């Protein structure tokens, strides 16, 4: 269970770094807004899911 928690936490940290760089770039680029908007919403949904998963796994690990 601990390894699963660590993997989920690592995925959350990596996705957070990607979103910190990717979202401002997507907002600043004038072309292909529809594709960028879908990627931002997909990344945001995945980020929220990972936060919930890490929270639940933290309950079981600690």
Curated annotation (Swiss-Prot):
Give the protein's function: May control the interaction of photosystem II (PSII) cores with the light-harvesting antenna, regulates electron flow through the 2 photosystem reaction centers. PSII is a light-driven water plastoquinone oxidoreductase, using light energy to abstract electrons from H(2)O, generating a proton gradient subsequently used for ATP formation.
Q: Which NCBIfam families match?
A: PS_II_psbZ
Which species is the source of this protein?
A: Thermosynechococcus vestitus (strain NIES-2133 / IAM M-273 / BP-1)
| GO aspect biological process, one term | photosynthesis
Return the protein name.
Photosystem II reaction center protein Z
Per the entry, the cofactor note is: PSII binds multiple chlorophylls, carotenoids and specific lipids.
Keywords from UniProt, A to Z, are:
Formylation, Membrane, Photosynthesis, Photosystem II, Reaction center, Thylakoid, Transmembrane, Transmembrane helix
The UniProt entry, under InterPro entries, shows: PSII_PsbZ, PSII_PsbZ_sf
Record topology, Cytoplasmic segments? 26-36
Q: Which intervals lie on the Lumenal side per UniProt?
A: 1-4, 59-62
According to its UniProt record, where is this protein mainly located?
Answer: membrane
- Cellular component GO terms, alphabetically? photosystem II reaction center; plasma membrane-derived thylakoid membrane
Compartments, record wording:
Cellular thylakoid membrane
Record note on quaternary structure: PSII is composed of 1 copy each of membrane proteins PsbA, PsbB, PsbC, PsbD, PsbE, PsbF, PsbH, PsbI, PsbJ, PsbK, PsbL, PsbM, PsbT, PsbX, PsbY, PsbZ, Psb30/Ycf12, peripheral proteins PsbO, CyanoQ (PsbQ), PsbU, PsbV and a large number of cofactors. It forms dimeric complexes. Part of a photosystem II (PSII) assembly intermediate complex PSII-I; crystallized from a strain deleted of psbJ, it forms monomeric PSII before addition of the oxygen evolving complex. PSII-I includes 3 assembly factors not found in mature PSII (Psb27, Psb28 and Psb34).
Family of this protein: Belongs to the PsbZ family.
Q: How does it sit in the membrane?
A: Multi-pass membrane protein
Please verify whether the record's keywords include Membrane.
yes
User: Taxonomically, which superkingdom?
Assistant: Bacteria
The annotated phenotype of a deletion mutant is:
Cells grow normally under all light regimes tested; it is dispensable for photoautotrophic growth. The deletion strain is more tolerant to photoinhibition, while isolated PSII complex contains less PsbK and Psb30/Ycf12 than wild-type and also has reduced oxygen-evolving capacity.
* Annotated transmembrane regions: 5-25, 37-58
What Pfam families does UniProt report for this protein, alphabetically? Ycf9
Sites where N-formylmethionine occurs are at 1
Indicate yes or no for the key word Transmembrane helix: yes
